[in-house]
Design a protein with these regions (language model features):
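Flexible phosphate-sensing "switch/lid" loops adjacent to ATP/NTP-binding sites
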Residues: 1-325, 342, 370-371, 382-510
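A conserved active-site-flanking secondary-structure segment within enzyme catalytic domains
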Residues: 337-394, 398
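Catalytic nucleophile serine of serine hydrolases
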Residues: 330
Length: 510
């Protein structure tokens, strides 16, 4: 049975996910078989495993850091918000329904055995399991039936490290307050504190470190600096998509729809010199981009209505008609078509059949069905028309997560793909406009831009349209780049945390 170590935070965005990923990398480098675990994740960014199970992307990143394949055992419960008060509940990789917060908390206790089983199965296969908590362990209003923070630590018999964010101020109050709100037996399980996102001279901090250790009896096991590392992190979502990006030679605008999902589909463009990737929410912010991307969403028709009401749909149509490239992924792809039929009234919660007119940029029609399609895919681009013709024949891979079936003229298909882990036939997928400006494309495949050379070909085509070219542009090996970033993170963990002490905590247990 594996030894377990739990990472909790004083608050959301304290850096739990990144610290967990870094420790996974260090343990892996030191020769241990290590796996991440988070009993319950709330996120719109998800991933499909080789078995077709849906899980949170944060644990996928941590699995990559640990040099192992992601498994739904690492995240048995995923909550995907569909509205301000409701979420789709996914258990062991499969959706079991959409629930209001009260409904979920009323049945949450029934999921504890599923969490225990997933953890025990995972622990039987590895030397170390790094468990990540959620939010704060001191949320006393939702402590009943907890299996996410200290409740999970008890289930796993795991010593706990508490991560605190100093960048936002009030770090000592947050450490002390968190520990004091824990029950005595829970507080005894916290064996160390990590101060995260520090800027400046750590010597100035030392008197405070000594005082907080004296007041709490819990040692500080390290101070991590504000680290510039490019690792996909659930906690960094708000910073990534709200930060202002300087407009460069090529300007790509991602429409930040209210229920945007899988924003990580576009990270690869940030690695290409001369490209700005902006997330926009208004016509004013949209400006004059070279390409507009409409991303995936957890509520296609709701977000399409938002596009209409905000004036963004009219702006996108105007851009498309003037020749700007428009690319839709998953829900964004569905929006580009003629209409979206919801025979069960699932998305609007009415339970009544309804049809929502699409944007009419692609000759496709989508009908929602009850069963979600979750599968890894591989294939290649077909005969791509227009500005992105250089993509024709290039291999692609990724995964699908959607509840709709889309009909389209096969001669307008964008790709031909088949399931990676099943004996499935090759099928036409995606669509493009083959008349007029030849500048609108759509696909269900998440990760479509990550394939070798695909993002670069797109940027080269956008440059050529402007009569420019980028000299000595390098094809990006996204996988190798991510490996380098994990190593940078591990180096910082080793340099700034007392790994000898952490190994002692791990060995001693609770």
């Amino acid at each position: 049975m594996a030894k377990a170590l739990m990472i909790v935070g004083t608050m959301s965005n304290a850096g739990k996910s990144l610290v967990t990923a870094g420790l996974c990398r260090v343990f892996n480098q030191d020769g241990y078989k290590v796996a991440p675990f988070k009993s319950q994740n709330m996120a719109l960014n998800s991933f499909i495993t080789a078995e077709g199970a849906e899980m949170g992307r944060a644990q996928v990143v941590q699995a990559e850091a640990a040099n192992i394949e992601p498994s739904v055992l690492m995240n048995p419960i995923l909550l995907k918000p569909t509205s301000d008060s409701g979420s789709q509940v996914i258990v062991n990789g499969e959706a079991i329904g959409t629930m209001k917060a009260g409904e979920y908390y009323a049945m949450k206790h029934t999921l504890r055995p599923e969490v225990q089983k997933a953890f025990d199965t995972l622990a039987s296969k590895f030397d170390i399991v790094c468990i990540e908590g959620a939010g704060s362990p001191a949320e006393i209003n939702i402590k009943k039936d907890d299996f996410v923070n200290m409740g999970m630590a008890k289930m796993a018999k795991a010593p706990v490290l508490l991560v605190a964010d100093i960048d936002r101020g009030g770090v000592f109050a947050s450490i002390y307050g968190t520990l004091m709100l824990l029950e005595d037996d829970e507080r005894a399980m916290v064996k160390g504190v990590i101060i995260n996102k520090f800027r400046g001279d750590v010597e100035i901090l030392r008197p405070g470190l000594k005082m907080i250790e004296e007041k709490t009896g819990v040692p500080i096991v390290g101070v991590l600096p504000m680290l510039k590392v490019d690792i996909e992190d659930e906690d960094s979502l708000s910073e990534r998509i709200s930060g202002r990006s300087e407009v460069k030679l090529i300007d790509i605008a991602v429409v930040r729809i209210p229920r945007m999902s899988n924003y990580t589909d576009f990270n690869v463009f940030e690695l290409i010199p001369g490209v700005s990737l902006r997330y926009v929410t208004s016509v004013r912010e949209l400006g004059q981009p070279d390409m507009i991307i409409i991303p995936g969403t957890k509520n296609t028709t709701g977000d399409l209505k938002w596009l209409r009401q905000s004036g963004m749909e009219a702006a996108i149509l105007k851009h498309a008609n003037s020749g700007t490239v428009v690319f839709g992924v998953c829900g964004g792809y569905q929006m580009l078509g003629k209409q979206i039929s919801d025979p069960y009234g699932e998305e609007d919660g009415t339970g009544k059949a309804n049809i929502t007119p699409g944007m009419g940029l692609l000759e496709i029609e989508t009908t929602f069905i009850e069963k979600k399609r979750t599968i890894q895919m591989a294939g290649k681009f077909g005969q791509v028309q227009g500005i992105f013709s250089a993509l024709s024949g290039l291999p692609l891979y990724g995964y699908e997560i959607h509840s709709g079936v889309t009909e389209f003229p096969e001669e307008k298909a964008l790709t031909s793909i088949s399931p990676i882990h099943e004996n499935g036939e090759i099928m036409a997928e995606g669509s493009q406009n083959t008349e007029g400006k030849l500048n609108v494309y759509g696909t269900y495949v998440h990760g479509v831009f990550d394939g070798d050379g695909i993002a670069v070909k797109i940027v080269e085509a956008l440059l050529a349209k402007k009569g420019k070219k980028m000299e000595d542009i390098q094809t990006i090996n996204f996988a190798e780049y991510k490996r380098q970033q994990y190593d940078i993170l591990a180096d910082s963990i080793r340099e700034n945390l007392d790994m000898k002490k952490i190994y002692e905590i791990l060995e001693a247990g609770v």
